[in-house]
Swiss-Prot record:
This is Ribosome maturation factor RimM. The gene is rimM. Keywords: Chaperone, Cytoplasm, Ribosome biogenesis, rRNA processing. PANTHER family: RIBOSOME MATURATION FACTOR RIMM. It is found in: Cytoplasm.
Length: 168
């Protein structure tokens, strides 16, 4: 089975001509223009992208051969997926969110914080949410170089350099 990556979630239909409203899971909204086809969660076939329109918070997609609301309604709530081979090459020190979720967080003093369970958008920065499985407590760390000096996918860990009071 190929490894698939989520690039969007179909939140609704748009109009009556088979268009779908998609919430992008990528920081790069124009990502869909680089794709010839995608998969839809729960379906094995490739869906070739027809038209793409942009709204402030969503992307409106249509697929070739799917020109009726009744045909595409079944896709509501499903994820738009790509094959791992379709990944974009990212700049150095930039990571896919899916690759970060599940990594272990440690302070620079080697104190275990927990696993990264979520990445939330807070203003202009993302915030990493680490969860300690023993206490079930969430620790929120701004995802900026000042507090996150190192991320190692190979070691499956994120190093955190918190200021006083940040993790208490």
């Amino acid at each position: 089975m190929k490894k698939m990556l989520k690039v969007g979630q179909i939140v609704n239909t748009h109009g009556i001509k088979g268009e779908l409203k998609v919430t992008s899971l990528s920081d790069y909204l124009e990502r869909f223009e680089e794709l010839e086809w995608v998969y839809i969660q729960g379906y094995d076939e490739k869906y070739y992208i027809g038209n793409i329109k942009y709204r402030p918070t969503t992307v409106i997609l249509s697929f070739e051969g799917y020109d009726n609301i009744n045909i595409v309604e079944q896709f509501k709530g499903k994820y738009v997926l790509i094959d791992e081979s379709q990944r974009r090459e990212l700049p150095e020190d930039t990571f896919y969110k899916a690759d970060l979720i599940g990594l272990d967080g440690y302070t620079v003093e080697e104190v275990y914080l927990g696993k990264l369970v979520d990445i939330i958008q807070a203003g202009s920065n993302e915030v990493y949410v680490f969860r300690d499985k023993e206490t079930n407590k969430d620790i929120l760390i701004p995802a900026v170089k000042e507090f996150i000096p190192e991320i190692s996918l190979e070691k499956k860990r994120i190093t955190v350099d918190p200021i006083e009071g940040m993790i208490e």
